[in-house]
């Protein structure tokens, strides 16, 4: 994740994994794209599960508010970053996936994350019926990419410039709360046109 998806070979991945067999990753996955899909599936499945659990725990009142729904979008990914080995690398990896036109991202998205993210979106649509469907869809897509890239940028800064920027110095709770505030504002902003 740190050097970029396009700049790493399966041989380098084997070496980083401590594999003496230089073709182990190719043997197990067949290609770099298949390895990328496997990583996405592994991490995405856990995030999906966390998000479904969080949504199921929302009260009726919370299901009618923007913030608890946005929290259900954000916190499962934050948990993956903070609570799992390699979670910080995963968010940087995910950010790179979204900017790589060579990958079939939509098939990965549909199979591993879209179910729980779609549930959040549908509940937000119920809370914000005044936002037209087309606008709501665009906003949600922009919010998703902004969330992924913001979390990835913070992780990069924490690795490359710890303590040097306000983002890297911010306590995780403050940073995530601020991100959620921004996403809530984006979701519920009145139409200007």
Language model segments and positions:
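C-terminal peripheral helix-coil segments that are non-catalytic and often amphipathic
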Residues: 114-193
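Short alpha-helical scaffolding segments that buttress acidic/His motifs in well-ordered protein cores
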Residues: 73, 77, 91-98, 143-147, ...
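Hydrophobic alpha-helical connector segments
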Residues: 52-90, 140
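Hydrophobic/aromatic residues within well-ordered alpha-helical segments
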Residues: 32, 39, 43, 47, ...
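Amphipathic alpha-helical packing segments from all-alpha helical-bundle domains
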Residues: 68, 86-92, 102-128
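Secondary-structure edge/capping motif, primarily at the C-terminal ends of alpha-helices
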Residues: 54, 58, 101, 154-161
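Helix-turn-helix
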Residues: 5-34, 38
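An amphipathic alpha-helix adjacent to DNA-recognition modules
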Residues: 29-52, 56-59, 63
């Amino acid at each position: 994740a740190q050097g970029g998806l396009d700049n790493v070979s399966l041989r380098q991945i084997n070496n980083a994994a401590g594999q003496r067999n230089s073709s182990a990753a190719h043997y197990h996955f067949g290609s770099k794209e298949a390895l990328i899909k496997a990583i996405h599936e592994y991490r995405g499945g856990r995030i999906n599960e966390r998000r479904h659990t969080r949504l199921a725990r929302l009260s009726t009142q919370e299901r009618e508010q923007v913030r608890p729904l946005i929290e259900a979008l954000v916190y499962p990914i934050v948990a993956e970053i903070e609570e799992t080995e390699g979670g910080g690398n995963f968010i940087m990896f995910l950010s790179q996936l979204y900017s790589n036109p060579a990958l079939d991202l939509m098939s990965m998205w549909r199979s591993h994350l879209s179910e729980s993210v779609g549930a959040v979106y549908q509940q937000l649509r119920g809370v914000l019926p005044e936002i037209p469907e087309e606008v709501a869809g665009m906003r949600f897509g922009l919010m998703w990419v902004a969330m992924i890239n913001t979390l990835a940028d913070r992780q990069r800064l924490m690795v490359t410039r710890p303590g040097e920027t306000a983002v890297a110095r911010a306590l995780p709770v403050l940073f995530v709360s601020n991100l959620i505030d921004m996403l809530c504002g984006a979701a519920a902003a009145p139409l200007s046109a």
